[in-house]
């Protein structure tokens, strides 16, 4: 969200070949003009944090509204604990389940108002908490709001709970006409409980908008996996909220689905512990996780093609067009997103009516992805569909997205890309029956533990990794993800100082 002033001065003076004093003077002028905000940096009193104004305001407001939501929650929990514990016990009995202590505590906290974070890896019971919370609360469906950052995550949430679930943008009634949300502190959500799934995907600005629309006294439950990739946008507010130690955090570490023999779940947790999954020996009986050793990118590519065209359809019965998603850490290279899409399109859908747009050929039946939010048409970044008709005379396409026929005129086709292969970042918040993922040192810059972990956890029934133990080892040992400069945790703890220059009101 910000740059440390000394780092900004050094970097800008080097990039622009100007005296550092000129850069420093320029920063001061920007602050006086209200273009940037400068704050004391708690970690070094001789330095400062330089923010774009909108990000500083978002952090500041978010801290303020989270403070309002958590005020008085501890007293409420103590006074109502016995009644809430009885409600949770009844819910567990009705559902025929036994809740772990961490799960039960998370539900008790959520029933008492305030903010609670539920974080855990795959198979640790996050969805069970949401289901039991809804059962125990006694609130009507109109009193509950379920949402997620992406349409696909919201759809999965609805399927798991039987409740309506929306994107956060829909929940807050985003208006393209007004370029903003209709729900805020002046017109808040009229609900008693808000549950957000895949909360680790929220950036600071989206979280700010959400918190502004929730009245004090409302329960806010944030469910996510902080070990996945951070948000694409600025900040990492779920991580900061946990780091602040200002809200209850339920850390789920017991794997409840382990009894089903899921190697996907076991391997994901293995990666998260910094361990390299073993290469799958030849002749291994059918299972749900495989690591196939291949050294060079061309061999990795050939193996992925064989998996998609023959091995997975024949051995597991998955349709490679609709049920198998190839994930890649990067766009470039032999096994990057761009080349994989070209090769897989030619392999899986080589013929049929087509339309060439800006160097991309779209064919009938192609798997495609929307890459921008379009609120007027109700299609969002990350939505996946299939080309249903090629309207060659109009230079347009009809795309089937979740059962809806969306027409793309020629001017809108830059919102579509081929999606036989997508980046791990694009796949976050989604799940697929099967995924295939290259792991190669060609993607050295992106070999990170949280990226590998996120990729593995996208697969529900089958995960196949293709690459080298060396690349896997680099990834699982690399926890040095790009650091996010934020002060949200410090704001929540009351450790930030007044702005040095009040250029912003």
Q: Could you say what each language-model-derived stretch is?
A:
Residues 226-377, 388:
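Conserved helicase motor core of P-loop NTPases
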Residues 215, 361-364, 380, 427:
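Residue-level recognition of short, solvent-exposed, well-ordered loop/turn junctions
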Residues 104-107, 113-282:
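ASCE P-loop NTPase helicase motor core
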Residues 85-101:
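N-terminal pre-Walker A segment at the start of P-loop NTPase domains
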Residues 1-83, 504-505:
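Accessory, non-ATPase domains that flank or precede helicase/AAA+ motor cores in DNA-metabolism machines
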Residues 97-111, 313:
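Pre-Walker A adenine-sensing motif
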Residues 273, 370, 381-505:
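C-terminal accessory regions
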Residues 43, 57, 151-154, 170-172, ...:
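Conserved nucleotide-binding/hydrolysis micro-motifs of P-loop NTPases
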